[in-house]
Amino acid sequence: MSMPTMTLVNQLLIALPSMPDPHFARGVALICQHDSNGSMGVVLNRPSEYTLGEVLFQMGIETASETLREQVVLAGGPVHPDRGFVIYDSEHVWGPSLLIGDGLYLTTSRDVLTAMAEGSGPSRALVALGCAGWAAGQLELELVENNWLMVPADASLLFDTALEQRWQRAAGRIGVDLFRLTDYTGHA
């Protein structure tokens, strides 16, 4: 009899103070895909050096929305840093999109950005350049090594919480105060 496969999709990874990788120190990542081949996610609390207005301009997409032009683009991770990823919350699906869970989608389609620029896109969306990737078994090992806490994804944390507050707030959802933890780990 085989063991059921656990999926980490639609989970938030919260880097513990002991996280050795500087790409993820004090990071929060949404796991978008997880299977026997590995995992893929997007870091949710690292601003890139770009605004959405700059990205749209480079893509030849115009928008009249000042709010959209000023939106910070996230540095989603060290993998494919020149590729755009859009996480959105909607009943409508734009282009080829991956359902993460509870009406939350991930896409690399230009369609959603065009719709956002025209005012007909999702009302809540995060745009990131790059993503995070883990080889088969790598993320599970990092969890065993106490590099991450894990909590179910929450749309309000993604879309309604300021970038600089996401790390603490995500951990707070399970009663953890990250500033009271040591950066030393061990196993009992």
Swiss-Prot record:
InterPro entries: AlgH-like (IPR003774)
Pfam families xref list: DUF179
Top-rank taxon: Bacteria
Cellular component terms (Gene Ontology): cytosol
Cystine crosslinks: none
Family, as annotated: Belongs to the UPF0301 (AlgH) family.
HAMAP family membership: UPF0301
PANTHER family to which the protein is assigned, alphabetical: UNCHARACTERIZED PROTEIN YQGE, UPF0301 PROTEIN YQGE
Protein name per UniProt: UPF0301 protein XF_2228
Organism for this UniProt entry: Xylella fastidiosa (strain 9a5c)
Lineage: Bacteria, Pseudomonadati, Pseudomonadota, Gammaproteobacteria, Lysobacterales
